[in-house]
Amino acid sequence: MTKAIIRLENLEKTYRVGETEVHALRGVTYEVHEGEFVAIMGPSGSGKSTLMNIIGCLDRPTSGRYFLEGEEVSTFDRDKLAHIRNRKIGFVFQTFNLLSRTTALENVELPLLYSNVSSKVMTELAKKALASVGLGDRIHHKTNQLSGGEQQR
């Protein structure tokens, strides 16, 4: 069996809304192994976004443990979490979250600003990424000049 890339142990997340406690996650235990594709599905309000925010290091669990590649993420400081978001975890969102006044190239370069690479390397990497999804000839197009499918890529 392949190793667990993501391991969640008894994750809980509780939000306080005024006087009310909202239990978004209760006792989630799960593993995602190398090479697996996973879909998180459920009705509205079932905790999908909360779970994804924790896995994506955008939020912390109230209790429980989260391991990424064997390291306990729940204890990391902000800088280490930012590094994980920049280098290890990525999401495909339902909405594109692109900056409308920038080009496809600039949108792809944006996350690389946090990676401490030169602007030349940043541009080369962004061009390579765009070419790999069939958008090499669209790098200078603004987001509103791209089709929905092109924006998603």
Located regions from the model:
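ABC family nucleotide-binding domain
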Residues: 3-153
